[in-house]
Structure formats: structure tokens, C-alpha cells
């Protein structure tokens, strides 16, 4: 009988403790991104961009625009300069692989702030 009461008290105590534990800190981490490239709509030659940073993006927008802000929010990314350009749905521009360095969308040079091919932060348009 004593063991049953001890178990009941222990179970009730642990249940109350689990219910009082906040989940927000574990489930919603944020990432702050500081972009060193200025927000620019000027086009620069591809030769001024590191080859590994050249991207072909389906859309290039300011971080404050609707689609970009939505993706950044869902990823938990906070961009300090909301006027910085971000590329959405990007892929690397490479000569290897038969692409001949071509881009049928928006060629940009982005900092190494990317989240897969979903979004690249700190982009500047380039001319190929």
C-alpha cells in the first residue's frame, strides 16, 4: 500500500513538473544574420565575385518583402538590415555539369549565408 501511494505522489509531481516546463525555448530557436554586403541593386561583373558564391536564383527580393520575410520567419532567421537582398530558390552557377555557367533566372553573388537552396542572404546581382 505504501508503494502505491509513493508511486501516485511521484507520478503526480512529475506530471505537474512536465506541464510547467516551457517549450518555446527548445522549439523556436532563432538565428541572427549580419550581412556585410551593402544592399545594392547595381550589377557587378561576375569576375568580382568568388566563384563559390555565384548563385542562380528564381527570385531576388529585399528581406522585408512578403515572400522573403515569410521564409526567413519560418526558418527563425533575423536579418539585421531588412533592405538587404535575398535570393529565393537558388542553385550554384557552375561550368562543370553542362550548365556552361548559364543562368536563366537571376544571377547573383551571395555571401555564405544560405539555408540549403531555399534562401541565400546578402546577394548582389551580377552580369555573366
UniProtKB/Swiss-Prot annotation:
Residues 1-20 form the signal peptide. It comes from the Eukaryota. GO terms for molecular function: structural constituent of cell wall. Glycans are attached at residues 50, 112. Induction: Expression is negatively regulated by the basidioma development repressor lfc1. A CT-rich motif, which is often found immediately upstream of the transcription start point of highly expressed filamentous fungal genes, is present at the expected position. Keywords: Cell wall, Disulfide bond, Glycoprotein, Secreted, Signal. Disulfide bonds join 49-109, 56-103, 57-90, 110-123. Transmembrane segments: none annotated. It is found in: Secreted; Secreted, Cell wall. The keyword Disulfide bond applies. The keyword Transmembrane helix does not apply. InterPro entries: Hydrophobin. One of its GO terms (cellular component) is fungal-type cell wall. Aerial growth, conidiation, and dispersal of filamentous fungi in the environment rely upon a capability of their secreting small amphipathic proteins called hydrophobins (HPBs) with low sequence identity. Class I can self-assemble into an outermost layer of rodlet bundles on aerial cell surfaces, conferring cellular hydrophobicity that supports fungal growth, development and dispersal; whereas Class II form highly ordered films at water-air interfaces through intermolecular interactions but contribute nothing to the rodlet structure. Self-assembles to form functional amyloid fibrils called rodlets. Self-assembly into fibrillar rodlets occurs spontaneously at hydrophobic:hydrophilic interfaces and the rodlets further associate laterally to form amphipathic monolayers. Belongs to the fungal hydrophobin family. This is Class I hydrophobin 8. The gene is Hyd-8.
Amino acid at each position: 500500500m505504501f508503494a502505491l501511494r509513493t508511486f501516485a505522489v511521484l507520478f503526480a509531481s512529475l506530471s505537474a513538473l512536465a506541464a510547467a516546463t516551457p517549450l518555446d525555448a527548445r522549439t523556436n530557436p532563432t538565428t541572427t544574420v549580419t550581412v556585410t554586403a551593402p544592399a545594392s541593386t547595381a550589377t557587378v561583373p561576375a569576375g568580382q565575385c568568388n566563384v563559390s558564391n555565384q548563385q542562380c536564383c528564381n527570385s531576388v527580393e529585399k528581406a522585408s518583402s512578403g515572400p522573403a520575410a515569410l521564409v526567413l520567419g519560418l526558418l527563425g532567421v533575423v536579418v539585421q538590415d531588412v533592405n538587404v537582398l535575398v535570393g529565393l530558390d537558388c542553385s550554384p552557377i557552375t561550368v562543370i555539369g553542362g550548365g556552361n555557367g548559364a543562368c536563366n533566372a537571376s544571377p547573383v553573388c551571395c555571401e555564405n549565408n544560405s539555408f540549403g537552396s531555399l534562401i541565400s542572404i546578402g546577394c548582389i546581382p551580377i552580369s555573366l
